[in-house]
UniProtKB/Swiss-Prot annotation:
FixJ, when activated by FixL, induces the expression of both nifA, required for activation of classical nif and fix genes, and fixK, required for FixN activation. InterPro entries: CheY-like_superfamily, Sig_transdc_resp-reg_C-effctor, Sig_transdc_resp-reg_receiver, Tscrpt_reg_LuxR_C, WH-like_DNA-bd_sf. Its cofactor is Mg(2+). Transmembrane segments: none annotated. Mg(2+) binds at residues 11-12, 55, 57. It comes from the Bacteria. Its main location: cytoplasm. This is Transcriptional regulatory protein FixJ. CDD domains: LuxR_C_like (cd06170), REC_FixJ (cd17537). The modification 4-aspartylphosphate is found at residue 55. The keyword S-adenosyl-L-methionine does not apply. SMART domains: HTH_LUXR (SM00421), REC (SM00448).
Amino acid sequence: MTTKGHIYVIDDDAAMRDSLNFLLDSAGFGVTLFDDAQAFLDALPGLSFGCVVSDVRMPGLDGIELLKRMKAQQSPFPILIMTGHGDVPLAVEAMKLGAVDFLEKPFEDDRLTAMIESAIRQAEPAAKSEAVAQDIAARVASLSPRERQVMEGLIAGLSNKLIAREYDISPRTIEVYRANVMTKMQANSLSELVRLAMRAGMLND
C-alpha cells in the first residue's frame, strides 16, 4: 500500500508515541517510532526520506540538540517540533535552527497532519535534488585517476587526439577510457556528461 510519506516520531513518552503512531497510521502515513533522539540519529544514514516529528524536551539529547546535529549534517528531512504549553522561547529557538514548524501540546490531530503534509511537500524537491547530487558525486568518485583526467578533457571540449597528446597515450587508449567514463557516469552523450559534470561542481571555475 502506498503511503502519503514516512514519519519518524521521537518522544520519550510511550503513551504519546503510541497515540501519534495510531493517528498517523490511520491518516495514511508510514510511521517509525524512536524513544530518544540519539537512536534516531544513529539510524539516520539508513533511513529513507521522511518528516521528523520530535518532542523538544527529552532526557539526554533534546529536540534543540537534535536540530543542531541535523543542521550540521545538512539533512534534508523536515522537522516539526512538539512543545509543552508556554514553551514559546524554545519553539522560537527551534525555528531559528531550521524546524519547519512547531506544535504546542495538546494539539488537534488535523493540525498535525496538515503540517506534516505541508512540510513533506515543501522539502521533497530539495531532498530529491540532494539524492541526485550524491549519486552523481558517487559516480565521479568511481572513476580512476586517468578516467577522471579524460573526463575533464572531454568536458573542456578537447578531442580524443588532444587528450591523448596531453597525457602522452594513444588515441585508441583514450577511446577505451572515454567509453569507461560514459559507462560509469551513466551518460549517453557528451552533452549529458557535461550536465552531470556541472551538477558535480566540475565546471564551476
